Structure formats: C-alpha cells, structure tokens
C-alpha cells in the first residue's frame, strides 16, 4: 500500500486536474453556443441569396460560368477543416479516417494545425494550410475560398470539396464530405440555400421577384453571385466545424472531470484506509511495549 504522503500528493494533483478540466468544459460550452449562434446568423444571407438566384434563374438561361463546367476528374481538391488544438475527443481522428479512405489522387488545403500535421505526417499533397480564429470572420475564410477557386480555374484540381465535422448535436459530430465545385446547376444551388435558410426563402412575405432590378443585366449578376455562394458555403461549414470542435471538447472535458471525481473518491478511500492502518499499527506497537515492560 502507498504511503499516506504519496496518496495526499496524488489527491492534490487530481484536484488540480479536475479544476482545470471543469474550467475548460465551461469555456468550451460558451464557445460552442457562440459558434451555433454565428451559424444561425447566416440564415438571412442564405435566404436573400436564394431569392435573388431564383429571380435570376427565371430571367436567363443556364449561365456559362466556369463554376458550372464539368470536366474529367483527375485530381480532387479537398478543404480539410480540423481543430488547432487537441483535447477534442475523436473529432480529428474521425476526419483523418475519411482522408485515409480516399484512394483517388487528391490535393489538400487545410484549416487547422492538427490537419496540417496529419497531411504532412502521412506524406499527402498539401497545397496550403490556413489558420482561422474562433470568431471565423468572413474575410478569413474568403482567403481559403479564393485560393481553392484559383486552383480549380487553373486546372490544378478538377473538383473542390470540403471535409468537416458536421454538427448534429452536443454528443454527435459527423465527418461530412461535401462537393462544392463544379456546381451541378443553379437550381441545385437555390435548393441548397433554401435548405440552409430553414426553407423560408421561397415563402417569406414581400419577397416578390418582380421587385428586383438587376444591373447591368441579369446574367452578369448571376455570374457574380456564384463565387459569393461558394465563399458563403465554405464560411458556413467552417462555422459548423467550430461548433463541433467546441462541443467535442466540452464533452471530453466533462468526461475527464467526472473521471477525476471518481478517482478522487477512490484515492480518498485509499488514504483513509492507509491512515487507519498506520494508527492501528501505532496502537499495536504501544500495547506491545506496555506488555513487554
């Protein structure tokens, strides 16, 4: 049995660990809530863009935009969204499993240090790596979007996809691979935007397409909106990934805190037993000394 001094030292260490994990759990919960609110805040933008694209689609034929041009897929371009830090449970490991299962040639643009380290460690083709703060400012994500669009237009990659941990609920984050480019059609873009807007884009009052005037012409505006759609889509998924990251970290820290509490109880019991044994031993020694005298 360990000495009471060693057990006291372990109890102190576990108490400190429990305090740290509890603080990290609270911080992660706060950040998760903010990330969810930020993701929901993008709904009005998606709604308005869906209305505009619906109005444009009725006025022009399918635009001949490079984003709508399909070609033979030789190299996939994948935006991998991971966390910068660990202590997030299996969040990153689940994403890396999806990457490992990709057998076709692919080049990666990575958001998050953990992803960049994995791509380098496994000797995959890394185009660039980026860092995005917890605020997930649109300007930060726009840099990533413009970089990947450039790779697509120059023929470096034949598709652009994004792999991120989709937020389902506090306990569930699902690795999801979403195609971004080339776009299948304007109608599919509208359907996706309406889905993100909660299905309200088509029926909101005062949303008459006839009130919209497009300058210089409808086709020019449509071609300008498609890159904005790609930027917005990437921004939305990075926000979603941040919510997943903070949620996974909150759950991991809660589990660690609960385990520390259980361990603290076991150590306290062990300490009491050791202390009781030491007292009993002292009593026996005193009694033995009295009998011998």
Indicate residue ranges for each PLM-predicted region.
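C-terminal beta-strand-loop-alpha-helix "lid" module of Rossmann-like NAD(P)-dependent dehydrogenases
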Residues: 1-293
């Amino acid at each position: 049995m360990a000495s009471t001094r060693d057990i006291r030292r372990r109890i102190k260490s576990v108490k400190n660990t429990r305090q740290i994990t509890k603080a990290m759990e609270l911080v992660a919960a706060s950040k998760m809530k903010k990330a969810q609110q930020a993701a929901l805040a993008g709904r009005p933008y998606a709604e308005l863009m869906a209305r505009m694209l619906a109005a444009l689609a009725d006025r022009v034929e399918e635009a001949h935009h490079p984003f709508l041009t399909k070609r033979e897929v030789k190299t996939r371009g994948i935006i991998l969204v991971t966390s910068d830090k660990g202590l997030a449970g299996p969040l990153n490991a689940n994403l890396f499993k999806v990457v490992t299962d990709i057998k076709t040639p692919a080049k990666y643009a990575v958001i998050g240090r953990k992803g960049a380290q994995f791509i380098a460690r496994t000797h995959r083709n890394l185009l660039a790596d980026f860092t995005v703060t917890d605020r997930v400012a649109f300007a930060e994500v726009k840099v990533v979007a413009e970089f990947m669009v450039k790779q697509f237009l120059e023929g470096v990659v034949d598709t652009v996809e994004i792999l991120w941990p989709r937020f389902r609920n506090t306990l569930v984050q699902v690795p999801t691979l979403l195609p971004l480019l080339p776009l299948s059609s304007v109608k599919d873009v509208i359907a996706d935007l309406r889905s993100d807007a909660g299905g309200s884009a088509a029926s909101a009052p005062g949303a008459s397409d006839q009130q919209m005037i497009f300058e210089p012409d409808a086709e020019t505006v449509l071609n300008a909106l498609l890159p904005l759609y790609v930027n917005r889509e990437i921004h939305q998924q990075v926000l979603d990934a941040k919510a997943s990251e903070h949620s996974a970290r909150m759950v991991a820290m809660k589990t660690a805190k609960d385990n520390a509490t259980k361990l603290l109880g076991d150590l306290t019991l062990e300490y009491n037993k050791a202390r009781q044994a030491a007292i009993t031993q002292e009593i026996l020694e005193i009694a033995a000394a009295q009998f011998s005298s």
